[in-house]
Amino acid sequence: MLERIKGCFTESIQTQIAAAEALPDAISCAAMALVQSLLNGNKILCCGNGTSAANAQHFAASMINRFETERPSLPAIALNADNVVLTAITNDRLHDEVYAKQVRALGQAGDVLLAISTRGNSRDIVKAVEAAVTRDMTIVALTGYDGGELAGLLGQLDVEIRIPSHRGARVQELHMLTVNCLCDLIDNTLFPHQDD
């Protein structure tokens, strides 16, 4: 059992090292897209399922409240956080539309959709991205594995941050780290001299 535990840590560390080599440019581009949207008076919509939903909510909470330093609130909405809306849509057997309907209702040109999907194939996330395209929104996609269907939907101005792993747990761990990096970059770009 102890060797298995050590193996989990080792695999996580190795994935982090690979991501540190592969992802800085994509993370930087994503952060700049998010910053530019906020500077233009737009907002960030976030969505995901399961652990990805938790990461989406963590991002939105860090924007609205704060990440590590006190600063003004920033507009972000986790589309998976409103249970009444979610259950109303799924009650009508529109599971695949659970986020797309919200994107069509709330999304505006210049907004960003932060779409988080471990494999990139979740139908409701794919539909949300398709809806964001029709609203002229920028998409930042956090994926893993081969990027899935999401990777094929992205345009030139969109950004995919694909975790270099085919293990769901490692992808999800690195998604959380990536979300924290994005929050840090946004704060340090918009509020460079803020202290705790």
Curated annotation (Swiss-Prot):
The keyword Lipid biosynthesis does not apply. The keyword Transcription regulation does not apply. GO terms for molecular function: carbohydrate derivative binding. Residues 34-196 form the SIS domain. It holds the Pfam family SIS_2. InterPro entries: DiaA, GmhA/DiaA, SIS_dom, SIS_dom_sf, SIS_GmhA/DiaA_subfam. GO terms for biological process: carbohydrate derivative metabolic process; DNA replication. Gene3D superfamilies: Glucose-6-phosphate isomerase like protein, domain 1 (3.40.50.10490). Required for the timely initiation of chromosomal replication via direct interactions with the DnaA initiator protein. Belongs to the SIS family. DiaA subfamily. Homotetramer; dimer of dimers. This is DnaA initiator-associating protein DiaA. The lineage of its organism: Bacteria, Pseudomonadati, Pseudomonadota, Gammaproteobacteria, Enterobacterales.
